[in-house]
Amino acid sequence: MITVVGLGVETGDLTEKGRQAILKAERVVVRTAKAASYGNVTALGVEHVCLDGIYEKSRSYTTLYKNLAKAVAEMGDGTVYCVDGAASEDNSVKALRRRMRGKIVVIDGVSKISALVEKAGFCGCSYQAASAYELSEIELSAPLVVYDMTDRQLAGDVKLLLADKFGEETKVNYINGDLVKKIPLFELDRQATYGDGAAVSVEKEELL
Protein backbone atom coordinates (compact mmCIF):
# COMPACT_ATOMS: atom_id res chain seq x y z
CA MET A 1 0.00 0.00 0.00
CA ILE A 2 1.16 3.52 -0.81
CA THR A 3 0.48 6.27 1.72
CA VAL A 4 0.09 9.94 0.77
CA VAL A 5 0.87 12.60 3.38
CA GLY A 6 -0.17 16.23 3.14
CA LEU A 7 2.68 18.36 4.52
CA GLY A 8 0.56 21.46 5.05
CA VAL A 9 1.49 24.99 4.05
CA GLU A 10 4.65 25.68 6.05
CA THR A 11 7.10 24.11 8.49
CA GLY A 12 5.24 23.05 11.62
CA ASP A 13 2.00 22.07 9.85
CA LEU A 14 2.73 18.32 9.68
CA THR A 15 0.24 16.24 11.68
CA GLU A 16 1.44 13.61 14.14
CA LYS A 17 -0.17 10.90 12.04
CA GLY A 18 1.69 12.16 8.98
CA ARG A 19 4.94 12.37 10.93
CA GLN A 20 4.66 8.76 12.10
CA ALA A 21 3.88 7.56 8.57
CA ILE A 22 7.02 9.24 7.22
CA LEU A 23 9.22 7.88 10.00
CA LYS A 24 7.97 4.31 9.47
CA ALA A 25 8.08 4.39 5.66
CA GLU A 26 10.27 2.02 3.65
CA ARG A 27 10.91 4.91 1.26
CA VAL A 28 9.87 8.57 1.19
CA VAL A 29 9.28 10.57 -1.97
CA VAL A 30 8.42 14.28 -2.04
CA ARG A 31 6.60 16.00 -4.88
CA THR A 32 8.73 19.16 -4.68
CA ALA A 33 11.49 20.64 -2.57
CA LYS A 34 10.41 24.15 -3.57
CA ALA A 35 7.44 24.42 -1.20
CA ALA A 36 7.85 25.89 2.28
CA SER A 37 6.32 22.74 3.77
CA TYR A 38 9.31 20.70 2.51
CA GLY A 39 10.94 21.70 5.80
CA ASN A 40 8.61 19.25 7.54
CA VAL A 41 10.44 16.41 5.77
CA THR A 42 13.99 17.68 6.21
CA ALA A 43 13.32 18.28 9.92
CA LEU A 44 12.76 14.54 10.38
CA GLY A 45 16.16 13.66 8.93
CA VAL A 46 14.84 10.77 6.84
CA GLU A 47 16.28 9.71 3.50
CA HIS A 48 14.04 10.80 0.65
CA VAL A 49 13.93 11.70 -3.02
CA CYS A 50 12.26 14.71 -4.65
CA LEU A 51 10.43 14.65 -7.98
CA ASP A 52 11.21 18.18 -9.16
CA GLY A 53 12.94 16.79 -12.25
CA ILE A 54 9.63 15.44 -13.54
CA TYR A 55 8.30 18.99 -13.89
CA GLU A 56 10.92 19.77 -16.53
CA LYS A 57 10.32 16.55 -18.47
CA SER A 58 6.52 16.88 -18.69
CA ARG A 59 5.04 18.43 -21.82
CA SER A 60 1.76 19.54 -20.24
CA TYR A 61 0.19 19.82 -16.81
CA THR A 62 -1.99 16.76 -17.44
CA THR A 63 1.16 14.84 -18.38
CA LEU A 64 2.86 16.15 -15.23
CA TYR A 65 0.21 14.69 -12.93
CA LYS A 66 0.33 11.35 -14.74
CA ASN A 67 4.14 11.25 -14.68
CA LEU A 68 4.23 12.02 -10.95
CA ALA A 69 1.64 9.31 -10.28
CA LYS A 70 3.57 6.81 -12.42
CA ALA A 71 6.84 7.53 -10.60
CA VAL A 72 5.23 7.07 -7.19
CA ALA A 73 3.33 3.93 -8.19
CA GLU A 74 6.52 2.32 -9.50
CA MET A 75 8.16 2.73 -6.08
CA GLY A 76 5.69 0.18 -4.74
CA ASP A 77 4.27 -0.79 -1.38
CA GLY A 78 5.73 0.89 1.68
CA THR A 79 6.22 4.20 -0.11
CA VAL A 80 5.08 7.46 1.48
CA TYR A 81 4.40 10.23 -1.03
CA CYS A 82 4.55 13.73 0.48
CA VAL A 83 2.79 16.70 -1.13
CA ASP A 84 2.33 20.27 0.03
CA GLY A 85 -1.03 21.41 1.36
CA ALA A 86 -3.84 18.93 1.88
CA ALA A 87 -3.21 15.67 0.03
CA SER A 88 -6.85 15.43 -1.05
CA GLU A 89 -6.49 18.72 -2.99
CA ASP A 90 -3.40 17.65 -4.96
CA ASN A 91 -3.92 16.81 -8.63
CA SER A 92 -1.06 14.30 -8.73
CA VAL A 93 -2.70 12.46 -5.82
CA LYS A 94 -5.96 12.33 -7.78
CA ALA A 95 -4.02 10.83 -10.71
CA LEU A 96 -2.34 8.35 -8.35
CA ARG A 97 -5.70 7.31 -6.90
CA ARG A 98 -7.00 6.60 -10.41
CA ARG A 99 -3.84 4.67 -11.33
CA MET A 100 -3.95 2.61 -8.13
CA ARG A 101 -7.74 2.19 -8.38
CA GLY A 102 -8.21 3.77 -5.00
CA LYS A 103 -5.72 1.50 -3.22
CA ILE A 104 -3.88 4.27 -1.38
CA VAL A 105 -4.06 5.70 2.12
CA VAL A 106 -4.38 9.48 2.38
CA ILE A 107 -3.32 11.43 5.48
CA ASP A 108 -4.49 14.98 4.91
CA GLY A 109 -2.71 18.12 6.05
CA VAL A 110 -3.39 21.82 6.47
CA SER A 111 -5.18 23.05 3.35
CA LYS A 112 -3.19 25.34 1.08
CA ILE A 113 -6.46 26.66 -0.32
CA SER A 114 -7.88 27.54 3.11
CA ALA A 115 -4.74 29.47 4.01
CA LEU A 116 -4.86 31.43 0.73
CA VAL A 117 -8.58 32.14 1.08
CA GLU A 118 -7.94 33.65 4.50
CA LYS A 119 -5.16 35.87 3.11
CA ALA A 120 -7.43 36.92 0.25
CA GLY A 121 -10.14 37.93 2.72
CA PHE A 122 -12.77 35.57 1.32
CA CYS A 123 -13.61 33.80 4.60
CA GLY A 124 -17.34 33.64 5.22
CA CYS A 125 -18.34 34.02 1.57
CA SER A 126 -18.67 31.74 -1.44
CA TYR A 127 -15.59 31.57 -3.65
CA GLN A 128 -13.96 29.55 -6.41
CA ALA A 129 -10.47 28.05 -6.03
CA ALA A 130 -8.46 26.53 -8.86
CA SER A 131 -4.93 25.39 -9.57
CA ALA A 132 -3.11 27.42 -12.20
CA TYR A 133 -2.45 24.10 -13.93
CA GLU A 134 -6.17 23.50 -14.60
CA LEU A 135 -7.44 27.06 -15.00
CA SER A 136 -8.08 26.73 -18.74
CA GLU A 137 -10.44 23.80 -18.14
CA ILE A 138 -13.01 25.51 -15.90
CA GLU A 139 -15.64 28.24 -16.08
CA LEU A 140 -14.29 31.18 -14.05
CA SER A 141 -16.22 33.25 -11.54
CA ALA A 142 -15.30 35.61 -8.71
CA PRO A 143 -14.40 35.74 -5.87
CA LEU A 144 -11.59 33.54 -7.18
CA VAL A 145 -8.27 32.23 -5.88
CA VAL A 146 -5.75 30.73 -8.32
CA TYR A 147 -2.91 28.82 -6.64
CA ASP A 148 0.17 26.80 -7.75
CA MET A 149 1.57 29.77 -9.69
CA THR A 150 5.03 28.24 -9.73
CA ASP A 151 6.87 30.37 -12.29
CA ARG A 152 6.70 33.51 -14.42
CA GLN A 153 5.57 31.69 -17.55
CA LEU A 154 2.64 30.11 -15.73
CA ALA A 155 1.78 33.49 -14.19
CA GLY A 156 1.64 34.87 -17.73
CA ASP A 157 -0.75 32.11 -18.79
CA VAL A 158 -2.95 32.85 -15.76
CA LYS A 159 -2.89 36.57 -16.56
CA LEU A 160 -4.16 36.00 -20.09
CA LEU A 161 -6.96 33.68 -18.98
CA LEU A 162 -8.11 36.05 -16.24
CA ALA A 163 -7.84 39.08 -18.54
CA ASP A 164 -10.22 37.44 -21.01
CA LYS A 165 -12.79 37.11 -18.23
CA PHE A 166 -12.23 40.13 -15.99
CA GLY A 167 -10.12 42.61 -17.99
CA GLU A 168 -6.39 43.30 -17.67
CA GLU A 169 -6.94 46.48 -15.61
CA THR A 170 -8.78 44.59 -12.87
CA LYS A 171 -7.21 44.95 -9.43
CA VAL A 172 -6.10 41.62 -7.97
CA ASN A 173 -4.15 40.46 -4.94
CA TYR A 174 -0.79 38.82 -5.60
CA ILE A 175 -0.10 36.43 -2.71
CA ASN A 176 3.22 34.75 -1.98
CA GLY A 177 3.96 33.59 1.56
CA ASP A 178 3.32 36.51 3.92
CA LEU A 179 3.15 38.97 1.01
CA VAL A 180 -0.29 40.18 -0.08
CA LYS A 181 -0.02 42.97 -2.66
CA LYS A 182 -2.76 44.64 -4.69
CA ILE A 183 -1.73 45.04 -8.34
CA PRO A 184 -3.40 45.48 -11.72
CA LEU A 185 -3.83 42.12 -13.41
CA PHE A 186 -1.48 43.02 -16.26
CA GLU A 187 1.42 43.09 -13.78
CA LEU A 188 0.87 39.51 -12.60
CA ASP A 189 3.84 38.11 -14.54
CA ARG A 190 6.14 40.97 -13.52
CA GLN A 191 6.57 40.06 -9.86
CA ALA A 192 9.94 39.33 -8.25
CA THR A 193 9.33 35.73 -7.21
CA TYR A 194 6.99 32.82 -7.81
CA GLY A 195 6.69 29.32 -6.37
CA ASP A 196 4.30 26.71 -5.00
CA GLY A 197 3.02 29.27 -2.49
CA ALA A 198 2.27 31.96 -5.08
CA ALA A 199 -1.35 32.77 -5.90
CA VAL A 200 -3.64 35.48 -7.20
CA SER A 201 -7.11 36.42 -5.99
CA VAL A 202 -9.86 38.31 -7.79
CA GLU A 203 -12.28 39.96 -5.39
CA LYS A 204 -15.23 40.80 -7.61
CA GLU A 205 -16.46 39.99 -11.05
CA GLU A 206 -16.43 42.75 -13.62
CA LEU A 207 -17.46 41.12 -16.87
CA LEU A 208 -16.15 42.53 -20.14
What would you call each of these model-derived segments?
Residues 1-107, 188-191, 198-199:
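Class I S-adenosyl-L-methionine
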Residues 2-5, 102-208:
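Beta-strand/loop-alpha-helix module characteristic of Rossmann-like adenine-cofactor folds
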